[in-house]
Each structure stands twice: as structure tokens, then as C-alpha cells.
């Protein structure tokens, strides 16, 4: 085991005192005595203080030593044989009393020299007394036997009394001595138990307990024996709680009580003990030990195993998935340029196995516990951000490629699309057949207007596509998708305010479609048109790249209304008329 002096120094605690003293800057020369003298004096002082201490301190020290022993583990090895020894001792004592002491009880109690005529001085004067044969040898021979029986009688009485006291102590510790009190604060209904009482919440206040302890002796006795057994029946809702007083005897006293029970003691005391009585005592010992210790304690152990298994199942299925969620502190880029997210390690989880401590020098040390090696390991670079989504070098923010299924902390991130180009499909979900990147530009403008003639028009449409390889691959006729079709979904929901008039009547360019509802003059979504007038064909050729400054001089004169219409129309289904074979992947709703 080590202790941290600094971030880079962690000496072992098992080292000698001189190395630790040198590291801490401690010099024993400043002390008045060495460690050896201190140990010698401490032993002497400890012995003197133990002798001169009060009896209560000695009792407390002995009690602490006794309570520190794990008695439950010694139930089968000590308690059972000890109880059987006590029962056998009581049976032997009662057998000797009934078979040896009781028949000679009269001889033991009376005086043996009461009728000894040889001691009388008056009878010694007569000659007749000298003719009577003397039996002094027989009396002397039996004298030690009566004395032994008298001593044995006293010893057996003391033994029986001592065994009765031990049995009373064991019965008290088993039946009354072990109880645990539980407070059921979240139980709404009364439990079906005789050991449950209804208590007031005012009894839990420190003030009430302090008042009881500082009051008279009679008040404390009344509180202990009267108030604690008071059952509150009509307490208001939320002002009471239930208290359970559970009987919890240990395995040691259970084994000792079953092997040396009060039933066998009472049976041996009230009956005349003989050799036949041993059969009843042995049978009683076996049955009681089997019922109480073997079956009853085994049942409690089995219930504990089932409760543990049930708790482990709940822990694995419910508690652990909710409390061990891997979390991180994230910093997400919320700008319109796209970008990524920076993730920082989070130390707020309850099961992160990461601890922050301070060394002797004041350095902050971050350690992580490794269950495999059972050691603490230093965690480096804990404050450095870890970018799981980073930008590709040489690609701008708008053209940043974002993973479609990036997994972050177990969740899959949805694909990001930087284009606001509306999808021509009825549903707004991305298509699964598109394998090219979306447009990096975001503007609430109408997609490219498609002329109906020429391959150049098809090429101008694919200038809107973010994939340049598609620009020269169109060699199909798209004249069947004319905008004269009023039932086409490409013109549905169009609310452009500039489509109600004949602003474009050139043949082959764009057909006039008069709205059935009249001009949408109440709501205007138009944007400012560019200062320079561009021809409509040039606008159609450029597509969504208005930053090009090279314009063809061979095209007919443009109309500013067409440019304004391009910038003001916000129809959600007017873009990408050539959707044969491909669809847009824009999953965002149309701009309205």
C-alpha cells in the first residue's frame, strides 16, 4: 500500500520509518527520546492505565473484545458441542443425586456419635460396659465415606445451580436479547405483523430525545416502558411512520439454545433421573437441534440466497443499466457552418471508478481503479477535449462530410444536410439511393429553373447538384416534364407573388400559368434582386452558383422579372424537375 507525496512520488507504507521520515523532512534528533524508549514506556503506561482504570473501563474493554469475535462462524464448532456438554453435565449431576445422594440423605444429615455410650463418664463406672464389644474400626472405616458423600452433595448442588444460571442466560440472549428496530417511512398501509407499531414523527426529533434524557429518572422509565409501546391510531396523514421490531438471534445462540434448551433442564429437574432417562434426553436433543438449527437456520440461509439472487437480477436488469450509463460532457458547434462536437470525460457518474485526490504537496491526482489488477492507475490528460467528429483537412465548413450513422455513447446520430433545397418527393425522408454529398449552400431560394430544350439545359440543371461528375452525364430528353402541366406536383403549393402576371411570354422558355386564386399580394416573400440584370437563360444555366461572374453574350436579353421570380419563389416542390433515377436527400422541411 502506498501514499502519495506528490504526483510522481508514491512510497510504500511498509517501508521503514527512516525512509518515510527522510521524505517528509522529519529528523529524530529533535525528539527527546527514540522510538524504542517510546514503545517501552507505552507498554508500561498501558499496563498501569489498565490496572488503575475504573471497573467500567475494564468491562468496556472486555465487551469490545467479545463483540469483535465472529460468533456465528463458531456455531457448529463451539456452540453445539458446548451445549451438549452442559446437558450431559446436568444429566450426570442429577443421576448422581437421585441414585447416590438421595438414598443416604438421612445418614448424611444426622450425627453419627449421638448414641456412642463409650463417651459417657457415668457409664464407664459400670463393669457391664467393658463387656460390650467395641466397633470402632467399622465406624472409622465408614467415616470417610460419609464425608465424601457430603462433599459430593454440595458440589452437585453448586453444579446444578450454575448450569441453571447458564441456561437462563442462554434463553434470555436467544429469546429476548437480540432485536433490531427498523423504521418504515415509506410504507403506506399497515404491515401484517404483530411486531409493527405506529409511531409519531415527533419522536424522531433530537429535541424530544434530549428532553427525555435530561429529565428525571421516572420520566425516562416511563418513556422506555410506556411511550415506546404506544400505538397511535388516529394520527393525521403524513405525520406518522411504522416501526418494526425484528427478532434476530444469532447462529451461535441458536445452536447453544437448541443443544442446551430449558425444556431438557426442566425435564431433568422435575423427574427422577435413571439410565432410561438418557434415551429421552438424547432424542430431545437431536430433534430440537435438527428443527431449530439444521432446518430453521438452513431455511433462513436459503431465503437469504433467494433474496440475494433476486436483488442481483434487479441490479443487472434495472439498476445497473440506469446508473452505469456512460456519460460525457459535450460541446456542440451550433453555427451554420456545420462543424463537429467536442467531448470531455465526465466524472459525475456513480460508477465511474474515477477518483480525484490531493497529494501531500497539494497536487490534484486523478486515479482510476482497475478491477483486473486491483490497483489504482493514474489517468492522464483528463482535461483535454476529445473530438470524435473532426473536420477533414482541405474541406470547407459547408462541404464538410458528416457520417450518416455516427454512434455516440450508444446512440446513432442522424445524417446532417447543409442544403435547404426542398425534396420533390411527397415525404421528407432522405432517399436511400443517393450516394453523393448534398449541396453545401443554404439559401431559401427556388431550385434551378429548367428550360425544356437542349442538352445545355440539362447540364444547367445538374449545376445545382453537389456532385460535379453528374454535370456531363445527362443525355436524356426531359421535355415530358414541362411546366405547362398544371397538375404536376412540381407546381403544387406554389405561393410566389410574381406568378400572377404575364412576365415571361417568350416561346420555349416558360409557359404562362395564371393562378386560380389571383395574385398573392397580401404576403410577400421576395428577396432583393441583384443590381445587375441577368438573362433568364444565364440564371438557369448557373443554377445555384450565383457567384460566377462569367456570362455568355450570345444569349437573348434577360428580364429582371425572371431573376426576381427566381429569388422570390419559395415553392417546396419546384426544384429538380429531372427526378427520373434520383431524388434529393434533404430531410428538412421546406422553407415557408
Swiss-Prot record:
Q: Name one GO cellular component term.
A: nuclear membrane
User: Which branch of life, at top level?
Assistant: Eukaryota
Q: Which residues cross the membrane?
A: 151-171, 255-275
Q: Where is the composition biased (Low complexity)?
A: 560-571
Q: Topologically, how does it sit relative to the membrane? A: Multi-pass membrane protein
Recorded hits in InterPro entries, A to Z, give: Nur1/Mug154
Q: Which UniProt keywords apply?
A: Membrane, Nucleus, Transmembrane, Transmembrane helix
Q: Where in the cell is it found?
A: Nucleus membrane
Question: What's the main place this protein lives?
Answer: nucleus
Q: Name one GO biological process term.
A: maintenance of rDNA
Q: Which Pfam families match?
A: DUF2418
Q: Where is this region: Disordered?
A: 547-592
Among PANTHER family, the record links this protein to: NUCLEAR RIM PROTEIN 1
Summarizing the function annotation, the protein's role is: Member of a perinuclear network that controls recombination at multiple loci to maintain genome stability. Required for rDNA repeat stability.
Q: Which family does it belong to?
A: Belongs to the NUR1 family.
- UniProt protein name: Nuclear rim protein 1
> What species is given as this protein's source?
Lachancea thermotolerans (strain ATCC 56472 / CBS 6340 / NRRL Y-8284) (Yeast)
* Organism phylogeny: Eukaryota, Fungi, Dikarya, Ascomycota, Saccharomycotina
